[in-house]
């Protein structure tokens, strides 16, 4: 038997522009292996549910290209299982799409150690970024810490390589290897009552859905600069969960967007603004690679001494979307039901927790990690630190979002709040009712009620006082 090419599948569930997949195919008949391991199960429940959808759809796509051979799904630790399999099949190199988090790098190190006695190696392929970390440097030769010059440098340089086409046909490995039945797989048993809501309201998954969504967005990109901050409108690309699991690559997005801007100049300004948001994602990953502790430690280390409040009751009310602040609660309920939250609303929700309630940003990040289908460790850590004021290129400490003013400006008719809040100002819609049906039974799920109006001003006043006192007693500048 010809030795196969093995793809260790952890991310990048796509055929197009998938360097790891193409490299494995070049080695020999394709064997794609996915492991249900400790790292997979450590992800948030909604993220695991979304990963399972990506896995099923990619398996079906591979079966079409291979004549019926899909993904071999195994339960256990990859570094304990793959070396013996590679030895039996006479395979000397293993291919994986890189995902440079601390946890994944530790797993990759264990895999390298397990393969070393066999004379085999692990080859990592860039699949989730436009440019390789370190390819763009600031004037002093170091990594960029501010977004604007980073974005200019990446735009001037362009992606590392063109987006590759999907392989037209794939020769599969025919060695019988068993594996779990994907049709009965359940990676998120802890979703409980929330599963039905995600299945009903979450966006379509899969590579084809991602490409269709991108093309649909580019058709209306001219309105993006004007409407992107409006949660009551369908004005964004909704590609974040596709990017999170790798159903579409940023290189594909970049190439299609640039081509559309050239063909349709009337959309060029909107596409340019959209690509600036793609570059924010890129920036966050370059920051994470340079500062791997970003999801758990303040970028500005002096902020570790900030006196965050240990207010368990307020945190629980925030997690349960019962703060009494309409825009905040609407956003948290949108996240619970759909696995996503509009970006403008995310900033308001995060500001309420970290500024009005003075609760540690890491508590908010943990809740988002459990509830988001588009969970991205780099983007979410950077954005939480940006709002809290402790991150690179962060918002100034006195930047405290006023939820009522934000709602007046960006949800002027109340359509967004009305959609998610039963009792906001009229009969509940299907989404608001679904919130009651999908949350744990011991939560308070009566009609939504606004909190006292004075709490906005009082919270802002207390936050400014605490932040000013902190700055006066630290080296924060």
Functional labels for PLM-detected ranges:
Residues 120, 234-422:
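Active-site-proximal binding-pocket segments
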Residues 141-298, 410-411, 415-477:
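Glycine/tryptophan-enriched, flexible segments
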Residues 1-166, 270, 333, 379, ...:
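Trp/Phe/Arg-rich N-terminal binding region typifying the photolyase-homology
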Residues 20-23, 55-59, 110, 131-136, ...:
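Intrinsically disordered, low-complexity boundary segments flanking structured domains
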Residues 51, 207, 321-324, 456:
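Generic alpha-helical segment signature
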Residues 104-107, 118, 193-196, 299, ...:
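Long, low-complexity intrinsically disordered regions
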């Amino acid at each position: 038997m010809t030795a196969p090419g093995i793809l260790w599948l952890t991310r990048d569930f796509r055929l197009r522009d998938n360097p790891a997949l193409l490299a494995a195919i070049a080695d020999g008949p394709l064997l794609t292996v996915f492991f249900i391991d400790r790292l997979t199960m450590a992800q948030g429940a909604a993220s695991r549910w979304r990963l399972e959808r990506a896995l099923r759809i990619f398996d079906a796509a591979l079966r079409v290209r291979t004549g019926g051979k899909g993904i071999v799904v195994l339960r256990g630790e990859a570094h304990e299982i793959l070396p013996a399999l590679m030895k039996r099949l006479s395979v000397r190199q293993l291919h994986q799409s890189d995902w440079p988090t601390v946890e994944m790098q530790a797993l990759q190190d264990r895999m390298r150690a397990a393969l070393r006695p066999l004379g085999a190696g692990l080859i990592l392929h860039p699949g989730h970024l436009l440019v390789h970390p370190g390819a763009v440097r600031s004037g002093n030769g170091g990594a960029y810490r501010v977004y604007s010059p980073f974005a200019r440098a990446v735009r001037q340089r362009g992606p590392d390589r063109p987006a590759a086409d999907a392989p037209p046909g794939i020769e599969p490995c025919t060695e019988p290897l068993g594996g779990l039945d994907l049709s009965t797989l359940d990676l998120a048993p802890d979703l409980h009552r929330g599963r039905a809501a995600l299945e009903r309201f979450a966006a379509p998954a899969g590579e084809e859905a991602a490409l269709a969504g991108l093309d649909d967005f580019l058709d209306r990109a001219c309105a993006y600069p004007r409407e992107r901050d409006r949660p009551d409108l369908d004005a964004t690309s909704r590609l974040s969960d596709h990017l999170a699991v790798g159903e579409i690559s940023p290189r594909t997005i970049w190439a299609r967007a640039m081509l559309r801007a050239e063909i349709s100049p009337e959309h060029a300004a909107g596409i340019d603004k959209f690509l600036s948001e793609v570059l924010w994602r890129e920036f966050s990953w370059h920051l994470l690679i340079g500062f791997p502790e970003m999801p758990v430690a303040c970028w500005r280390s002096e902020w570790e001494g900030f006196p965050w409040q240990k207010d368990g009751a307020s945190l629980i009310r925030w997690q349960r979307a019962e703060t009494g602040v309409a825009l905040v609660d609407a956003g948290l309920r949108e996240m619970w039901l759909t696995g996503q939250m509009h970006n403008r609303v995310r900033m308001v929700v995060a500001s309420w927790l970290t500024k009005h309630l003075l609760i540690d940003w890491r508590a908010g990040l943990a809740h988002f990690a459990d509830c988001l289908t588009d969970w991205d460790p780099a983007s979410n850590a950077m954005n939480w630190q940006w709002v809290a004021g402790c991150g690179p290129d962060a918002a100034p400490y006195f930047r405290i979002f006023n939820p009522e003013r934000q709602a007046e400006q960006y949800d002027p008719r109340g359509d967004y709040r009305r959609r998610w809040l039963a009792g906001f100002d009229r009969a509940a819609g299907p989404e608001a009712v679904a919130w009651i049906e999908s949350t744990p039974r011991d939560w308070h799920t009566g009609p939504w009620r606004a909190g006292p109006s004075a709490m906005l001003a009082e919270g802002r006043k207390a936050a400014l006082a605490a932040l000013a006192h902190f700055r006066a007693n630290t080296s924060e500048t």
